[in-house]
Swiss-Prot record:
This is N-(5'-phosphoribosyl)anthranilate isomerase. InterPro entries: Aldolase_TIM, PRAI_dom, RibuloseP-bd_barrel, TrpF_fam. Belongs to the TrpF family. It catalyses: N-(5-phospho-beta-D-ribosyl)anthranilate = 1-(2-carboxyphenylamino)-1-deoxy-D-ribulose 5-phosphate. The lineage of its organism: Eukaryota, Fungi, Dikarya, Ascomycota, Saccharomycotina. GO terms for molecular function: phosphoribosylanthranilate isomerase activity. PANTHER family: N-(5'-PHOSPHORIBOSYL)ANTHRANILATE ISOMERASE. It comes from the Eukaryota. SUPFAM superfamilies: Ribulose-phoshate binding barrel.
């Protein structure tokens, strides 16, 4: 089971996530989004991660694979997250890093059976991502139980300290991913990051 704090834009928030045991922290590498990370801050966050056991994820959306690989090298990413309509197999072989691939439920569920958990892990999220829109967890859990799949998925979309315990109980979940749910007025809230991760740890151990 893993916990991911996404959409980080400050060294302070990244340090809080690392100090409180986040497995993954994510920076948005898509240009001109409200949570797009400043390149200098991304490099600083990368330095915070290395040697701690927390892995750095770069989030991309329909960007050329050459750009993805360039930024992956520049920021020393550990994982690449594809949030658009990319062919994950093409990107996996070119970028050479483990992938998270956004899956919209129920539209994209046929893709999940094609994903190899070692190379590409599905991440259920809304179409836009980062919107705070809660998915239909019951429907996703029921689909997973009926699917006969052995590999699980990360769950995003509308998570917060208020519902992370519920999210961890959804069938097939191997990780939880939060962004807006640990913000106050559009900025990462250090207390909420700590609360989310503490609740996560208590309920997975």
């Amino acid at each position: 089971m893993i916990a991911k704090i996404c959409g980080l834009q400050s060294v302070e928030a990244a340090q809080q996530a690392v100090d409180n045991g986040a497995d993954l922290i994510g920076v948005i590498c898509v240009p001109n989004r409200k949570r797009t990370v400043d390149p200098e801050i991304a490099r600083s966050i990368s330095k915070i991660c290395h040697g701690t056991g927390t892995r750095l994820v770069g989030v991309f959306r329909n960007q050329p694979k050459e750009e993805v690989r360039q930024l992956a090298q520049e920021y020393e990413l550990d994982v690449v997250q594809l949030h658009g309509d990319e062919d994950w197999q093409e990107y996996a072989s070119y970028v050479g890093l483990p992938l998270l691939k956004r899956v919209v439920f129920p539209r994209d569920v046929s893709l999940v059976s094609q994903m190899d958990g070692e190379v590409c892990t599905p991440l259920f999220d809304s179409e836009a991502g980062g919107s705070g829109e809660k998915l239909d967890w019951q429907a996703i859990g029921s689909w997973f139980q009926d699917s006969q799949l052995t590999r699980g998925y990360l769950l995003a979309g509308g998570l917060s300290p208020d519902n992370v315990v519920e999210a961890l109980r959804v069938p097939g979940v191997v990780g939880v991913d939060v962004s807006g749910g640990v913000e106050t007025d559009g900025t990462k809230d250090l207390a909420k990051i700590k609360q989310f991760l503490e609740l996560y740890k208590v309920n997975v151990n």
